Amino acid sequence: MPMFIVNTNVPRASVPDGFLSELTQQLAQATGKPPQYIAVHVVPDQLMAFGGSSEPCALCSLHSIGKIGGAQNRSYSKLLCGLLAERLRISPDRVYINYYDMNAANVGWNNSTFA
């Protein structure tokens, strides 16, 4: 159930076609979870500043049941910052990513939970 959310001040017109699909495939590979369970939400055109500057930036979160922890998070950061830099032209030093290890009982899906 990994869920990756990107809030960014990059305009919608600058988000390339296929970006959501690329994020889905890359996260599936990185987490080892099936792509059909990966959710991606990109929220462009936000009023945002990072370090007092309105240059392109992103505030992100990755939620997952398991597969969250020190070494894994560093790997995800490298992957996700790289994709944001390459596709949205956001410098990695203008990106924060918060990681959340979710309890399966606290994640609802398909009329139930993952517990």
Swiss-Prot record:
Subunit structure as annotated in this protein's UniProt entry: Homotrimer. Interacts with CXCR2 extracellular domain. Interacts with the CD74 extracellular domain, USO1, COPS5 and BNIPL.
Location in the cell: Secreted; Cytoplasm
Residues annotated to bind substrate: 33, 65, 98
Positions where N6-acetyllysine occurs in the chain: 78
Record-level GO BP terms: carboxylic acid metabolic process; cell surface receptor signaling pathway; cellular senescence; DNA damage response, signal transduction by p53 class mediator; inflammatory response; innate immune response; negative regulation of apoptotic process; negative regulation of cell migration
Primary gene name: MIF
Protein name: Macrophage migration inhibitory factor
Enzyme Commission designation: 5.3.2.1, 5.3.3.12
Organism: Homo sapiens
Record-annotated active site: 2
N-terminal signal peptide: none
